[in-house]
Amino acid sequence: MAEDGSPATIETTTVHAEVLDDTDPTHLRRVAELRTTGVDVLDTLATQRASLRSLTPAPGELELTETPRWIHYPWRRTVVRLLGPLGFRRLRLDRNRNKITTAEQEQLSQLRIGIVGLSVGSAIAHAIALEGTAGSLRLADFDDLDLSNLNRLSATILDLGVNKAVLAQRRIAEIDPYLRVEAWTCGVDEHTIDAFLDGLDLVIEECDSFDVKVLIRDRARRRGIAVVMETSDRGLIDVERYDLDPDRPLFHGLLGDIDSASVAGLSVREKIPFGLRILEGSALSSRMAASVLDVGTALSTWPQLGGDVLLGGASVAAAVRRFGLGEPLPSGRVRIDIGDHLDQLREPHLPRDSTSSAADHTVRTDALDVRSLYDTCTDTDAVAFAATRAPSGGNAQPWIIDVDTTRLTLRIDETRSSTVDIEHRGSLVALGAALHNARIAAAHRNILGATEVSFDGTARIAFATGTDPQLAAQLPGMLNRGTHRGAPETDPASTNLADLTDLAAGLSTETHRIHLIEDRDTIDRLAETISATDRIRFLTDRLHREMIAELRWPDSNDLDTGIEVTSLGTPAAELVVLELLRRPDVMTHLNHWNTGQVLRSETTSRLTASNAIAVVTQTGTSAGDYIRGGALAEEFWIHTQSLGYSVHPMTPLPLYATAEHQLRHLSTDRIDELTTLWNELKTLTDTTDNNPATLILRIFRTTTPAPTSRRRLPHHH
């Protein structure tokens, strides 16, 4: 019975797609019977299974071993063999990922949605079914397909005279026979509305009748059911969240305090002003507004275009996703007006920091004549200049260099630190490299006096008559030293590393050692570990922002610091990927999905193809220990490059952590993974918390020179 006591007449379809199970003898007899009637049989099960097995990640055992089904479509006189519901859904919806994740797809499959009006509503139902964003659909329309509907409704002339709800139901069954779809061929009225709304989470209203529009909202409000409407003119999306605000007025209050009782008995003419208020006449397109005035004289009804209806289907499908996932979808209206957007067509703007602009520039290997600049310096300035040529993480140059006639002083610039620079240890290593360079220049200019490294991490060189031939001989190599981030060009196993082994042994001291890793298995494991820490750096918002901030494009205003993108060793054609890697919102999604393994690929490939990995280690963790370790690393780098090798320093995320609590400073969300990687790194590099790594260097052969990076000028007094 309906609410007013009158009998409710509900008409639904009785001709559905039959789903027949291979393991049910009764169903198998039905399939055999159908074959005798001359139905067409379509069996591509082998191909479907092959496609299912090829998916990444691999399907589970239940999906792979599930019993297939036969689907009988009586209106097509066809029987189709398909994967069972689990495998079918996994394969059919696989290309949704990760616009819709697997977990989100499962959440959306619980939605129960009703659609009233299957002209515009047909496109909406189709879009929802395509995306698999509902577990059941209830479709209501009393009208049959007319030839005049074929300008906007996806059907064919073979469907003329078929009820519109039935047409939508059939179309969906041919997309997903496992999706529950009810077709209410009686439409919706005062007697059937309550039964229609029973169990629904959301109702989409696309009917022509003003009375029914009011009725649906009135009863949906009583039940706390949200209502969405799309009007194809200028792409109007209308959302009324009665589930969140059951006291809100119908139609956002545009019609005042109205309900279904207050509009009962109004004439068609009396309803026209209400319709115009709902449509907001001032916001109609000019063609639609003019057409409304012609309805009944020059036009039989208001116009609708197929493209606009299809857009409406996509728009409402997007709203359904938000609703089902609990994402922001407030009550209100918005217009998705394609015409307005087409009026805004413009030539694309190429930002100065785009990868396209970077691709137009080649790697600059001789833009700076470092030796000529050095030769033009006074003796004290030459020492300061040499200090600036030291390497540092992200080319941050985290030092303050003061020079006068008596000495050069180096100290940490804490403003140039980063999260990875735990307790400024990376900065101290860079300071040590700068100190070594300065001593080389002082020896070359014959002004090398006493060197002092203070407990607080300050380093000084006094200027006095003096030299060191071994230091002075390193000048050409020091000025030519550079970071090469490119890929190796030779087989890593084909190079004899005896010269490198001798160098590492000769430079090692009792407190600071150079450990050369040549074993291919160890290098491969290091590549896996270090690349995994790189992935965490990408996926952790603060670390990602700091990393991207280090990059410099050719037209940047600050090329004296940071890393020029043209020096990354990435082929110009692949630089476009940087446009994705630099976006925090992209990394946020990958982090949420726990994916993004591709973020490891470049580090992995570069490390595994290297000839050797050098690990500079130290005894102790004082500031002086890191400074002296940095000086040793720089000396080794200079000599290694002079032997014809290329060098690329690697900074695994936990490199400068010497206690587990310091890892939380890096990434609280991935602390367990990071702790595991930290322990693996220490094992592979033979380091401990008291004998940590100073620096890790990737060493390889290539015929291309390292690009020359720019530097800030030192301070003078």
Where are these regions (language model features)?
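Mid-domain beta-loop-alpha active-site segment that forms a flexible
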Residues: T301-G324
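Glycine-rich phosphate-binding loop and adjoining beta1-alpha1-beta2 segment
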Residues: R81, L139-D176
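Phosphate-binding loop/pocket of nucleotide- and phosphate-handling active sites
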Residues: E3, V31-R95, A319-D381, N395
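A structured beta-alpha segment of the ubiquitous adenosine-cofactor-binding alpha/beta core
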Residues: A165-D201, C207-K213
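Acidic, surface-exposed loops and disordered segments
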Residues: D308, P328-H717
